[in-house]
Amino acid sequence: MKVHSLFLMAIFFYLAYTQLVKAQPRDDCQTRCGDVPIDYPFGISTGCYYPGDDSFNITCEEDKPNVLSNIEVLNFNHSGQLRGLIPRSTVCYDQQTNNDFESLWFRLDNLSFSPNNKFTLVGCNAWALLSTFGIQNYSTGCMSLCDTPPPPNSKCNGVGCCRTEVSIPLDSHRIETQPSRFENMTSVEHFNPCSYAFFVEDGMFNFSSLEDLKDLRNVTRFPVLLDWSIGNQTCEQVVGRNICGGNSTCFDSTRGKGYNCKCLQGFDGNPYLSDGCQDINECTTRIHNCSDTSTCENTLGSFHCQCPSGSDLNTTTMSCIDTPKEEPKYLGWTTVLLGTTIGFLIILLTISYIQQKMRHRKNTELRQQFFEQNGGGMLIQRLSGAGPSNVDVKIFTEEGMKEATDGYNESRILGQGGQGTVYKGILQDNSIVAIKKARLGDRSQVEQFINEVLVLSQINHRNVVKLLGCCLETEVPLLVYEFISSGTLFDHLHGSMFDSSLTWEHRLRIAIEVAGTLAYLHSYASIPIIHRDVKTANILLDENLTAKVADFGASRLIPMDQEQLTTMVQGTLGYLDPEYYNTGLLNEKSDVYSFGVVLMELLSGEKALCFERPQSSKHLVSYFVSAMKENRLHEIIDGQVMNEYNQREIQESARIAVECTRIMGEERPSMKEVAAELEALRVKTTKHQWSDQYPKEVEHLLGVQILSTQGDTSSIGYDSIQNVTRLDIETGR
């Protein structure tokens, strides 16, 4: 049993390691920096370059790619060479201090300088030292002597310029260049004020005595060749575990450690990607030797020359020669067999055509059945009977929805919940929408569903996700909404895809927008609507962090002559109104409770229900109310939002949240009152002070009773804020 466990563990680690070495870049990686293409194994961000080796990490600043901080990349190939620019090091003569010099060092990590580079010194009466640091330290250099300017067209042979070949050990992780000059430089300083030491690719620097000795023609960086490879092991050592992709092969690096990849003959591309090596079409690129009498046909990795019927290919000249003709045998049997085959094919094609027509008719009938079953006829009748109005419901087809979601591809899923699955859809006009595919529901509720579609399509509020239309030709109806790009409030507060950077101003504004939206739905919509599933996951944020209330799948319409409905309890734990949960009676105060939980989340940054918290504080409401009662609100408020200037606003918001989450619904304020109080929190301190002195005047101006806790009246001041708030709620947009 123990041996079996060890064997399984060994297989697990082997697979994990194989996955690591086979790692591939993300699909969204940046592929260019300025004019330089960036190909894997190099990359610009984490997950885009070969993992575990920062030598492949490219930093892109001002459209210039750099590797290892001070080496600018010009280009690189897949065979293990990188061409880059590195700065020179300089020493200048100064009469005060004799010398003013700088030395430069370069970090190499897993890169190494190619033997095709030369270490070069330009200057008179100077010498330069190259030092490497690693397991083996290495030093070399050269000296240049001259008291007068060298003659024009001089070579770099030790007079005004010297160069040397270097063989830098592979284990070197750092290289330093340092030029120096002799002490007495008065004889040369007028034509050679400074000396320069640098690496340069062989053939990329030609010494010009007068110009270079003066200022090196103002060149500050020189091209060099660097060698790179994958890891430290050979192809034999990593057989089956290298990162070479399909149609490629592994070869040992020429620098003595690691390996590189190359595409097989007949293929081209990036051999380090899983399918980077693609077939070369020799026929279209004219990389073939077929004669004019033969036809080139491309094959995978190669090609062949095809001769016309009646001729054969001469493999020496690759031309076509006539084939000796023979009289056909059994011509009668061939004719019979050919006729039988053709007849059989005609029968098969006819049967296939009939089956296709029957399948098309069946699908059409099924779509029509679903359309009627989902209330399509009722919807068309209601739309035609409504006459000219602001109802704008578009009925989409099943084919259009399938095409928009790429066949309901899992990669298009934006989210999943109790009400269904939401897909990202791209319509034929390239507009992006959110398509909600509901779960199978109660067929008896079709009329109510159609009513909700009609009512929701009339909601024209800037903080409600707009319903664009629906598709009724599927087994379950599809709803099409406008697409909101920046995720949900839950993602911003708790998710890993966003940094929690919402300021108090952002959070207060979001709370005001959501409260105003719910007040609009409760009080000013043509038919009052109770959302029934208010939570941070159903509040979307656009690119400006403007709140958009979404997911009305659980919503219910309240007839004008009723204040509440008896329904099957539905909602999300942590946000669910306890009174509604116990009685099944749904009214607008259920949304007030859920909004209070959302407000607590905005204030605390904590989840509504968290099993990682202690049992007594597992539910955010009890946790929050307890902190308020024990006067330790500061312990639960998110540290990113509270400061000395907004403590009063946060305390007032916390009080409103507690009022909204009272156990008895009748003790909770209405959303209209909540929206007014939250809007008032943005009033300046002077207005707050005025309202503290004249609370009756404030109450008269606001037109609503101010909420209070334990006799402490909250001032909301600002003589016109209620009118503004009411206008926002009533008009929507």
Swiss-Prot record:
Residues 408-691 form the Protein kinase domain. GO terms for biological process: cell surface receptor signaling pathway. It holds the Pfam family EGF_CA. Its EC number is 2.7.11.-. The modification Phosphotyrosine is found at Y481, Y580. Residues 24-330 are extracellular. Its main location: membrane. Residues 352-733 are cytoplasmic. Serine/threonine-protein kinase that may function as a signaling receptor of extracellular matrix component. Binding to pectin may have significance in the control of cell expansion, morphogenesis and development. This is Wall-associated receptor kinase 5.
